[in-house]
Structure formats: C-alpha cells, structure tokens
C-alpha cells in the first residue's frame, strides 16, 4: 500500500477518472467512488500498469451514510487518508444543453445540483477531517469552475460552485494550525470523451486543442499535494491552467492549457486564508462602541 492515500468521488468517468489515473501514475493509492461498478472497473483498467493503484468503491453520494461508510472503509484498509477530491456531480435530466431561464427548469434540480454537488462534498469533508486532523496532515480539494463567478449553465450550477469556493475558504479558517489544507479549483473547458466525440475544433469559441485533459487536472492536484507552499495556499481558489503553467505541467499531447480568466470576468473570489484580513469585531466590542454588528437580525 502506498504511503499516500486518496479518495476521488465520482471517479467512474470524465474528470474523476482522469484525476484518479494521474494520481495513480504519481504513485498514489486511489479510492474512487461511483454508482456503476462497470464504469468504476473502467477507471481501474485505465490505471493498469501505473506505479500506484486504483480501488473502486460503489457509493450513492445522495446518502450520507454511504459516504461515511466509504471513508471508514478506507481507514480500515490503510489507516489513513491524505487527499480528498470532491468531484462527484449529478446531471439532472435535460440539464445539459438547456438554454432556458431558471424558472423554466424543475425545482427538483436543487436536490441534484446542491444535494449531491454540494451537500455530499460537505459530508465528505467532515468525514475526511475526522481522519486528517488527528494525523496532522491532509488536503481536501473541491472541483469548481468559472461558473462560480460568471453566469454559466444555470443559476443553481453557479450557486453550487460559489458555495464550494466559500466552503474551502471557511474550512481553512477552522483547520488553521492542524496541518490540513483546503482548496477549490477552477477548471477550464475539459476534453472529456463527450466533448471530443462531437468532432469540433472549438467549443463556444474556445480552442479544444488548448483545453484541459482530465489527467491534467490530476497532475495539478498531485503537484499541489506535494507543494511545500500548500499551507500558505489553504482556503484559496486556484485556476488549474495557471497553476499548471507555473509548474510546467502539460496535457497528454504536450500542450499547455489556456486560462479562461479573461473570458469569464476575472479571477477567483477567495484568496488564501493567510492573506485575508477579516477585522471582525466581537459583539461586546461593537456594543461598547455603541454600534451595530452589521449582521442581519443582530
């Protein structure tokens, strides 16, 4: 068993599969979750021959108890957990390709996009922290996107991504001094099998030959986990293409992916916790000054 153990949720295809195989290439023991045993086997096969290994675990991330059981199984097998990659996501029926307004979509989209795409990540972080904090080390990564800042897909999609960034930021405050770090990653356009199968040279004007491979995202995460400056980055949102360029990382074909920063209105909303100057006064300090604490209802 490798000394480094990772959990990649939603690892049966796409970004999750790419991250898992890249981590295995870097020597990690990687547990991947998904609802389809057959698709999970595909991820295991994709990592065949790598220095590390991929171990599949079936999990319905809409159920808290199954997430808890996954982390417990990993600890029972290996005694530790060094990396959590929150990638699992549910695509509501008719969501992909939908160009209408938010009020034209079913309200039930909330349960998929924020239930699995947000709640499941929170539950996984809670369980991972119970392992990482006592061992004094670890990294928790949320897979986010530029949809956190710019209108993208639907209102609920953007809400879920902004919440993931804020989650990483606030968790970093509470994890300060424990040796555990949290990050949120803004991925660009990803060259998944679905995108490549369309046979296009560009996607909404963005050249596919400079988009990101799923494995590129995995290389970025592997580099972050080994980065000596990681504690100083904790709580921040990082653009994968920009970090990858800085570290000399490339796609499978050797190309360097482009950042989407200019196309979507700028950079991340949350800097590292170490750079944040909160300056929040206590309730007693506000009362003594005769002021209002600024919080609704306060």
Predicted regions: what they are:
Residues 12-14:
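Conserved glycine-rich cofactor-binding loop
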Residues 47-65:
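Rossmann-fold cofactor-recognition segment
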Residues 125-126, 169:
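A short, exposed helix-loop element centered on a Lys and neighboring polar residues
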Residues 90-94, 104-109, 139-163, 168-177, ...:
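Catalytic loop of short-chain dehydrogenase/reductase
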Residues 99-111, 115:
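Short, well-ordered secondary-structure patches that form non-catalytic structural/interaction elements
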Residues 184, 204-281:
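C-terminal helical subdomain
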Residues 26-43:
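Conserved glycine-rich Rossmann-like NAD(P)H-binding loop of the short-chain dehydrogenase/reductase
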């Amino acid at each position: 068993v490798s000394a480094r153990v990772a959990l990649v949720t939603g690892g049966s295809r796409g970004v999750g599969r790419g991250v898992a195989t890249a981590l295995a290439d870097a020597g990690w023991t990687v547990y991947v979750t998904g609802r389809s045993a057959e698709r999970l086997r595909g991820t295991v096969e994709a990592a065949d021959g790598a220095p590390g290994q991929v171990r599949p675990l079936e999990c319905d991330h809409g159920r808290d108890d199954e997430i808890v059981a996954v982390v417990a199984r990993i600890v029972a097998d290996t005694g530790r957990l060094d990396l959590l990659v929150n990638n699992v996501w549910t695509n509501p029926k008719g969501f992909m390709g939908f160009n209408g307004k938010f009020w034209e979509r079913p309200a039930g989209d909330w349960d998929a996009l924020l239930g699995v795409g947000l709640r499941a990540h929170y539950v996984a972080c809670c369980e991972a922290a119970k392992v990482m904090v006592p061992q004094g080390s670890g990294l928790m990564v949320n897979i986010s996107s530029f949809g956190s800042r710019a209108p993208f897909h639907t209102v609920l999609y953007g809400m879920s991504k902004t919440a993931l960034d804020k989650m990483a930021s606030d968790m970093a405050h509470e994890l300060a001094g424990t040796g555990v770090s949290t990050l949120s990653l803004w991925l660009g356009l990803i060259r998944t099998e679905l995108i490549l199968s369309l046979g296009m040279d560009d996607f909404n004007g963005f050249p596919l030959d400079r988009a990101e491979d799923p494995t590129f995202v995995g290389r970025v995460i592997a580099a972050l986990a080994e980065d000596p400056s990681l504690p100083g980055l904790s709580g921040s949102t990082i653009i994968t293409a920009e970090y990858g360029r800085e570290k000399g990382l490339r796609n499978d074909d050797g190309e360097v992916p482009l950042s989407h920063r200019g196309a979507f209105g700028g950079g991340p909303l949350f800097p590292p916790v170490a750079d944040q100057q909160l300056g929040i006064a206590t309730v007693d300090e506000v009362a003594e000054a005769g002021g209002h604490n600024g919080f609704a209802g306060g």
